[in-house]
Amino acid sequence: MDPVLHVPAFQDNYIWLIRGRRAPHKVAIVDPGEAAPVLAALRTHKLTPVAILCTHHHDDHVGGVEELLEHFPLPVYGPAREHIDGVSHPLSEDARAVVPELDLDFGVLDIPAHTAGHIAYHGNGMLFCGDTLFSAGCGRLFEGSAAQMAQSLAKLAALPDDTAVYCGHEYPAANLRFALAVEPDNRAAQAHLTQVQAWRAAGRPCRAAAASSFTSDS
């Protein structure tokens, strides 16, 4: 059983549902940009939410929080340096996001650049990095600098090599086409694009890979 379910939202967002180790019918919801697809997934898979984890304040990642709270009285974890309605547990670097119902314990990293207070959750072999790191790319600099992005990516690159990376958007094909426009003879990019296209044709999200692979590709 996959420990993480993906819920497509909007045009290219991913909302993640993390299953409990000992209670796979319970889940934590990561970056619910809208509530409707989450509620549908919960019904379809007969899942019970126990927490919400937010990486940053952009509406396409938190727009569904308030509606979900109308259905479920959940703890909401989020960045301490950003205002997100509904957050009950503000977090910054070296804090822990502990979800006892799922037997999960996540560390928190401050990874500013895309937004000023962006955080990531890591642990249990997983990384939820919001809009900082993508397959073959990184997030746009809306509130930070290139130097901050480099520092944030360096933090992510230092995580264990076998960390599964869960990003906030389905961007790899566009990122790789851009890379090939700049370096048309880049065989690694060509091979990666072919793989990504095969994944998408099979309905698979391009979301989880080794942290070392993601950061080196990006």
PLM feature segments, named:
Residues 1-47, 120-130:
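Conserved beta-strand hairpin/beta-sheet module of binuclear metal-dependent hydrolase folds
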Residues 154-164, 173-218:
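Accessory terminal helices/loops
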Residues 17, 96-122, 158:
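Core dinuclear metal-dependent hydrolase active-site scaffold
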Residues 52-62, 109-116, 166-172:
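Histidine-centered catalytic micro-motifs
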Residues 32-34, 57, 81-82, 114-115, ...:
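Active-site metal-binding loops of divalent metal-dependent hydrolases
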Residues 26-27, 34-107:
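Active-site HxH/HxHxD metal-binding segment of metal-dependent hydrolases
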Residues 18, 31, 56, 68, ...:
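Divalent metal-coordination and catalytic microenvironments
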Residues 138, 142-163:
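Active-site-adjacent loop/tail segments of enzyme domains
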